[in-house]
């Protein structure tokens, strides 16, 4: 049986704050897209649809999850790797919900066939605060052993290496957030949850007015960075586009030190021959 999970992200381009990835596992088919891409919705519309998504999950029609990557992780590893982390963490939340819910029917029977040792391993893996790539691969292997194959559909045209980590098909869909209802839901989940976080961060860092621009590179935000300097949640990797002082200076090649040697003594001709 396939577990088809639909994925989209929010917060790829901002100068500050985390990246968020939303994920949706439908338990019924959605033929009409009532959700739309989060980018073309107003904040009020997104909030209303997010509440509808929560209600849809409470009716057992979907399971949803999310994953994040911090600004520090973006600086350390780059955006592609951060997206991989976010996708894997979102998938982990979905699989944890699947495991805990023991969905009725074929999926439930598969989970019930999980032996005690596998169950303990899964619980320990789910409890880890920072799951490694190896741990996520192990979770996917256990589900695969139970006859539950993962299949991911991601908005855009890149897999971020998730297919290699989870050893599962990953379908990329350009403009998927406008075409596929479940990807639209994932887009709204990621956007709304990230906005909530940025509003809260605005209380901790009032000098940047995060509640207004959500960390994106507006002129106001850039002016505030120039005035106050960057905070610890700003992405130094992204700031260099606007602030030359964040560009890495090329390292000067090390010059080899010349070792002074004593002058060689000339040997007499007889010594050279023998």
Residue ranges and their predicted role:
Residues 1-274:
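RNase H-like, Mg2+-dependent phosphodiesterase core
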């Amino acid at each position: 049986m396939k577990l088809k999970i639909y994925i989209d992200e929010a917060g790829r381009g901002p100068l500050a704050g985390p990246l968020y990835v939303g994920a949706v596992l439908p338990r019924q088919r959605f033929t009409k897209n009532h959700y739309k891409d989060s980018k073309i919705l107003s904040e009020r519309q997104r909030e209303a649809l997010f509440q509808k998504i929560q209600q849809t999950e409470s009716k057992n029609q979907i399971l949803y999850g999310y994953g994040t990557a911090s600004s520090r992780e973006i600086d350390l590893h780059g955006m592609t790797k951060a997206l991989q982390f976010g996708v894997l963490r979102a998938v982990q939340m979905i699989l944890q919900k699947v495991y805990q819910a023991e969905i009725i029917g074929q999926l439930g029977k598969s989970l019930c066939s999980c032996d005690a040792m596998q169950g303990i391993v899964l619980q320990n893996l789910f409890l880890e605060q920072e799951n490694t790539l190896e741990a996520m691969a192990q979770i996917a292997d256990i589900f695969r052993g139970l006859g539950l194959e993962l299949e991911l559909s991601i908005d855009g045209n890149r897999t971020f290496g998730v297919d290699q980590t989870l050893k599962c098909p990953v379908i990329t869909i350009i403009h998927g957030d406008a075409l596929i209802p479940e990807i639209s839901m994932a887009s709204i989940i990621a956007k709304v949850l990230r906005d909530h976080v940025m509003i809260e961060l605005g209380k901790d860092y009032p000098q940047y007015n995060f509640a207004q621009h959500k960390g994106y590179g507006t002129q106001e935000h850039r002016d505030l960075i120039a005035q106050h300097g960057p905070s610890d949640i700003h992405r130094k990797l992204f700031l260099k586009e606007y602030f030359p002082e964040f560009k890495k200076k090329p390292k000067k090649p090390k010059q080899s030190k010349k070792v002074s040697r004593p002058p060689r003594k000339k040997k007499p001709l007889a010594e050279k021959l023998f």
